[in-house]
């Protein structure tokens, strides 16, 4: 019977180790994505700040691939605001995903601790 419990604990530890490694990779990926989105948001904000200093009737060129499109200041301003809003929403989603992953690993660790305590109590 002790061998079956030890085998069960060994299996649980291996699963936990795999889950921890997988979660760490996912958390690192989420951190990288959050950093990238923060840079995108900051870039859009700085660009918007610069174009707001120009006269309202100013037309500007927007780079699209290999070409440039003539746009009004208002259109570009709205695009930059939308870009910031989308980046903010994605950052919020990634933060939630990251906290969920960390919570799930903690729960798995707690479950193994409970198994060890039950094993010691026997």
Swiss-Prot record:
The modification N-acetylalanine is found at residue 2. CDD domains: Prefoldin_1. Keywords: Acetylation, Chaperone. Signal peptide: none annotated. It comes from the Eukaryota. InterPro entries: PFD_beta-like, Prefoldin. GO terms for molecular function: unfolded protein binding. The keyword Cell membrane does not apply. One of its GO terms (biological process) is B cell activation. One of its GO terms (cellular component) is prefoldin complex. The keyword Ion transport does not apply. Belongs to the prefoldin subunit beta family. Binds specifically to cytosolic chaperonin (c-CPN) and transfers target proteins to it. Binds to nascent polypeptide chain and promotes folding in an environment in which there are many competing pathways for nonnative proteins. Heterohexamer of two PFD-alpha type and four PFD-beta type subunits. This is Prefoldin subunit 1. It comes from Mus musculus (Mouse).
